[in-house]
A protein has these predicted regions:
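Membrane topogenic/interface segments and analogous intrinsically disordered interaction regions
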Residues: 1-248
Length: 248
């Protein structure tokens, strides 16, 4: 019970701080909706090395609140979500403290490394979503039009929910090496088999990237490369896990 109260207390405190920093918080969250966001400028720079006249047209997408309480409730829920994200290192620390008395010294060291890797990979997924997947998806979907007579107006709820969904999705996807390690330790996955099906995996990754991103080549490349690198890392991780099985 004390553990839960400590976790809840830290999460709420961070959420309150974030809630009080309303302008700064939403300046960061809404930055990908601006046409001069850093991702668009970097893509322009890279593409101009290949296509000299490439550039992103300036765009503007209206964000609206349709309910009386929607802005407040979105502010509140976003603060809680970011509070939980900000408190996650402390939560992992408390959970480790809770189970550590039952662990051997070697298991404690192993657990600390695994927790650090899981957290690092999750945060890399969050950054991947913020700087690549979400802004490019927003640009495509927000400016897509079936007719000049139709003007896109997006609700704040839709914007934030999509942002959170993609962030969590990429955070989970980036756990592939960790999942592969445990599957390798259980003997379910073999490094040689993963290497043999490398080309098949690349095609599957490209298909998944094409589904979750706008249909343009640059976006496909930006999403496919890190996902495929995760697969390559997973092969090496599974190879280590397979060797550990033989030595155990």
């Amino acid at each position: 019970r004390k553990l839960l109260f400590r976790i809840l207390g830290v999460t709420v405190c961070i959420a309150v701080i974030i809630f009080s920093l309303k302008n700064e918080t939403f300046r960061i969250l809404l930055a990908p909706s601006e046409w001069d966001f850093v991702t668009y400028r970097k893509i322009e720079y890279v593409m101009k090395l290949v296509v000299t006249d490439f550039h992103f047209d300036s765009f503007y997408v209206d964000l609206i609140a349709t309910d009386l309480s929607s802005q407040f409730m979105t502010h509140l829920s976003t603060s809680l979500y970011l509070g939980l994200l900000g408190a996650s290192p402390y939560i992992l620390y408390e959970l480790f403290r809770f189970v550590s008395p039952a662990l051997y010294d070697s298991e404690k060291k192993y657990s600390i490394r695994m927790i650090a890797i899981v957290y690092l990979l999750f945060m890399l997924g969050v950054l991947m979503s913020y700087y690549v997947l979400f802004p490019i998806s927003f640009h495509f979907l927000g400016t897509y039009s079936v007719s000049e007579k139709i003007h896109s107006t997006i609700t704040l709820d839709s914007y934030i929910s999509t942002f959170v969904t993609l962030t969590l999705l990429m955070g989970v996807v980036f756990q592939l090496p960790v999942i592969s390690y445990f599957l390798g330790r259980m003997g379910i996955v073999d490094a040689k088999l993963m290497s043999y099906y490398r080309k098949h995996a690349f095609l599957i990754i490209m298909f998944v990237a094409a589904v979750i991103t706008p249909p343009d080549l640059m976006t496909l490349i930006l999403v496919t490369i890190p996902l495929y690198l995760l697969y390559e890392v997973s092969i090496r991780v599974v190879k280590i896990a397979n060797k550990q099985i033989k030595t155990d």
